Amino acid sequence: EEAADALTEALDKVLESSVLDSVNKNELKRFMSGTAMYTAFDFTGDEKYRNAAIELAKGFKDFERNDNGYFKDADDKKCLCKAYQYETFYMAYETKDGGKEQYNDVIGQYNAMNDELFATVKYSQDRTKALKKLSVYAASLIDTMEVMDQMIYEIFRKMQDYYKASVKAVLESGVAAEGMDDMDDEAELIFAYAVLKGCRMKALHTEKYEGIVLGVCDKVMSGEIFTGEDTEANDTIISMAALVYSETVRNREYQDYGRGKGGALWS
């Protein structure tokens, strides 16, 4: 209940300040509040949050695309990590209010992004940046899988394949054996979140993967993640630590969210 109150209070400030209207219409980050709007609607039943999400989703229709067919950000930079800014909300909107008409576009953008960027990131010499991009990409995929209608199995399975490949790419770099020393705190946390959620959703075998990130969970639970070289944790670290914590306390048994009901946000 306290978490719900904090969420709605923050979103009310966003809506009252019209901050969304001030964000560059060509920036993908403008969509990042969309899923939170649906979560608030689910908690409260207040239509203003749902209406805000629907209004925000209108921006998908004419959003500029790059030469490979997926959304082009204002900075013109391509990155697997940018999927996290919009794909989950795009799928959530389509499941809840879009009639699933653009499901093929959601997976189509993942397909194009994956084909163009995944191998380059996986084999990048800049290991630290690559691990962060792969971790964020994995989180985007598992979050998108959670909010879709799983009856559309072909799309669900394709995203699962991409998700598993991303997790595997991180682990093949040796981070598990080395204790994730090559990952900064943000990457470490988002990877732990993605793996824990994948285990809960049975996208990964719990027995094989959960133990790999339990050390990160221990750091969150003990507060160690907040006491590194920095004297204070920034908001991003705190938010990501909260995501990891939420997965450590949730039921490990994956609940079928109801075939036909769509994603977890509104089951």
For every predicted segment, state its role.
Residues 1-34, 40-55, 63-68, 77-78, ...:
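CBM-like carbohydrate-recognition segments
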Residues 53-72, 105-108, 112-115:
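Short, charged, amphipathic alpha-helices and their helix-cap/turn boundaries
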Residues 71-76, 97:
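Membrane-interface helix-loop-helix junctions at boundaries between adjacent transmembrane segments
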Residues 80-84, 88-192, 204-226, 232:
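Extended ligand-binding clefts on enzyme/binding-domain cores
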